[in-house]
C-alpha cells in the first residue's frame, strides 16, 4: 500500500492506522493527514502544511 495514501480527492481508500498520509485527499481517511499535528487537535484536517520540524502546522497552530 502506498504509505502516502495518495488517491483522487473524495475517493474512498483504506489508510492504515500507521499511515502518515502526507498527501492524502481521501474523504474516508479518519485521521489527520499531517504528521506534525499534535494528538487530539480538533481543527486538524487533510491538506494542512507542516511548519518546519516543530509540532505546529497551518491548521492547528
From Swiss-Prot:
Span list, region Beta: 1-29
Keyword Phosphoprotein set for record: yes
Residues annotated for a divalent metal cation 4 binding in this entry: 33-34, 44, 48
Record-linked SUPFAM superfamilies: Metallothionein (SSF57868)
Residues modified as N-acetylmethionine: 1
GO CC terms of this entry: cytoplasm; nucleus
One Gene Ontology term from the biological process aspect of the record: cellular response to zinc ion
Residues binding a divalent metal cation 5, per UniProt: 34, 36-37, 50
UniProt modified residues of type Phosphoserine: 58
Binding site for a divalent metal cation 6: 37, 41, 44, 60
MF GO annotations: metal ion binding; zinc ion binding
Residues annotated to bind a divalent metal cation 7: 50, 57, 59-60
Residues that, per the record, bind a divalent metal cation 3: 15, 19, 24, 29
Residues reported to bind a divalent metal cation 1: 5, 7, 21, 24
Keyword Acetylation appears in the UniProt entry: yes
PANTHER family, per the entry: METALLOTHIONEIN, METALLOTHIONEIN-1B
Protein name: Metallothionein-2
Phylogenetic classification of the source organism: Eukaryota, Metazoa, Chordata, Craniata, Vertebrata
Gene encoding the protein: MT2A
Amino acid at each position: 500500500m502506498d504509505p502516502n495514501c495518495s488517491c483522487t480527492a473524495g475517493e474512498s481508500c483504506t489508510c492504515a492506522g500507521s499511515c502518515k498520509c502526507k498527501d492524502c485527499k481521501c474523504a474516508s481517511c479518519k485521521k489527520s493527514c499531517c504528521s506534525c499535528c499534535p494528538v487530539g487537535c480538533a481543527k486538524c484536517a487533510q491538506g494542512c502544511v507542516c511548519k518546519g520540524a516543530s509540532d505546529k502546522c497551518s491548521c492547528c497552530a
